[in-house]
């Protein structure tokens, strides 16, 4: 799925997880990539990849977003696509969660995406392009104990829709990819635990996804194969959002009825 040969792409949150897998996928498809993450150390793995340039910086800084686009254009040519993937998760419910944590999550997950979007659009506007935002099933449904994360992901999913409406006349497509439980640093604390096992039991496919499975969908969206796809929020979730969440389905399967 996807053909990104010679596409010039920026990817944020490229140091691990979905961002790292996306850079690898795009490099395999012979794209020219600027990979952005918070520290130089998190980008050292890029050294063996051809046509990939790294930039260390904080996506909440407007100058970093401008620099990543300028670096891509100066190094490789006109910008074709942006993958706005950087994000954080802080646990906490509405009663006990702190506003400090809330502000931090919103700053990275929403402000960082908005800044990246504006910078990418400024570079793409003459010729068009594609922007893929990493949302989450937590932007499509609610979770217990993740209030700030839920708000932030709901915001960027709707940002993708709004941007698709605003930018279509410029031939710029904007979509959100909404992963479910994926084996990344955000979920490593649940793996092999009672909570993790319960999460897997509620997934129709019966397992967590891999970052590469999300990267494949992102690579499709950055390619010309998705030329008529915009304003979409695409679940990559093992089927978790296909159901209502009612217990009967899962209990029936466990008892052998389904």
Residue ranges and their predicted role:
Residues 15-16:
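Conserved glycine-rich cofactor-binding loop
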Residues 117, 152, 160:
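Active-site helix of classical SDR
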């Amino acid at each position: 799925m996807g053909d990104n040969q010679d596409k010039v792409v920026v990817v944020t949150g490229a140091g691990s997880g979905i961002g790292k897998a996306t850079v690898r996928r795009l490099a395999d498809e012979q794209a020219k990539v600027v990979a952005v993450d918070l520290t130089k150390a998190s980008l050292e793995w890029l050294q063996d990849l051809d046509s990939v340039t790294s930039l260390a910086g904080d996506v909440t800084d407007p100058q970093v977003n401008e620099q990543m686009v300028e670096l891509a254009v100066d190094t490789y040519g006109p910008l074709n696509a942006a993958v706005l993937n950087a994000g954080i998760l802080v646990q906490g419910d509405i009663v006990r969660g702190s506003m400090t944590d809330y502000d931090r999550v919103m700053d990275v997950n929403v402000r960082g995406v908005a800044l990246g979007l504006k910078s990418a659009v400024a570079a793409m506007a003459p010729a068009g392009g594609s922007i893929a935002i990493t949302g989450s099933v937590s932007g499509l449904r609610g979770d217990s104990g993740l209030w700030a994360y839920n708000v932030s992901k709901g915001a960027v999913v709707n940002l993708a829709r709004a941007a698709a409406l605003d930018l279509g006349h410029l031939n710029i497509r904007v979509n959100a990819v909404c992963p479910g439980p994926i084996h990344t640093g955000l979920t490593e604390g649940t793996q092999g635990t009672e909570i993790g096992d319960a999460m897997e039991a509620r997934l129709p496919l019966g397992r967590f996804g891999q970052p590469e499975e999300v990267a494949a969908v992102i690579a499709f969206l950055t390619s010309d194969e998705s030329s008529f796809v915009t304003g979409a929020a695409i679940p990559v979730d093992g089927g978790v959002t296909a159901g209502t969440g009612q217990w009967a389905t899962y209990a029936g399967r466990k008892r052998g009825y389904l």
